[in-house]
Regions:
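N-terminal membrane-targeting hydrophobic helices
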Residues: 1-181
Length: 181
């Protein structure tokens, strides 16, 4: 999978998180920061960190490892940022969902390996391969026809989800404006 699919899903969760903020339209820089944070969270298991195991889809794609990290981050956020808009339960839940969406999306790809979602408890791999989803070939240029095809398929598959979340976010803001009027 490419970062495009993960990023589009991260933006989808960011739009929903921002719809819960009362003054989201008045804080453009904050909104950009939230969007970038959610995109980073959605791509986090693929970050090239030492001993992270991304190339094997084990440590970095384990539900146990990621859930433990998410719980740690939430505990820190709740402790250090008590009362701030970004420490609210709905915002933190959407951030966690953006992070965990990575595991589900990677299981859709047709590389045949699956992901070791239950590592270290089990060596079983989750493989929900969808035939038209494939990985990009890093040995080829990013602009090669095969890689552009992978990007295009991801764009077509995940953009409707982003558009749907933007529509839901718009409706939430409109209802809030009507309730306040």
């Amino acid at each position: 999978m490419t970062p495009m699919g993960h990023s589009l899903i991260g933006l989808s969760f960011a739009s929903l998180a921002l719809s819960t903020s009362k003054n989201a339209t008045n804080h453009r820089w904050r909104n950009c920061g939230v969007a970038l944070t959610f995109v980073a969270l959605a791509n986090l298991p693929d970050w090239p960190l030492p001993n992270w195991g991304h190339d094997r889809y084990d440590v970095s794609h384990s539900i146990f490892v990621n859930a433990g990290l998410i719980c740690t981050v939430i505990a820190v956020m709740k402790t250090l940022a008590t009362g701030k808009w970004f420490s609210q339960p709905r915002f933190l839940m959407l951030a966690a969902m953006a992070w965990l969406s990575h595991l589900l999306l990677d299981s859709f790809y047709n590389h045949g390996n699956g992901i070791a979602i239950y590592w270290p408890v089990s060596s079983q791999r989750l493989n929900l391969a969808i035939p038209w989803f494939s990985n990009w070939d890093l040995s080829q240029p990013v602009t090669s026809p095969d890689n552009l095809s992978v990007f295009g398929i991801e764009f077509l598959a995940y953009t409707p989800i982003l558009l749907g979340s933007l529509l839901v976010s718009y409706e939430i803001r409109n209802r809030r404006a009507l309730d306040e009027a």
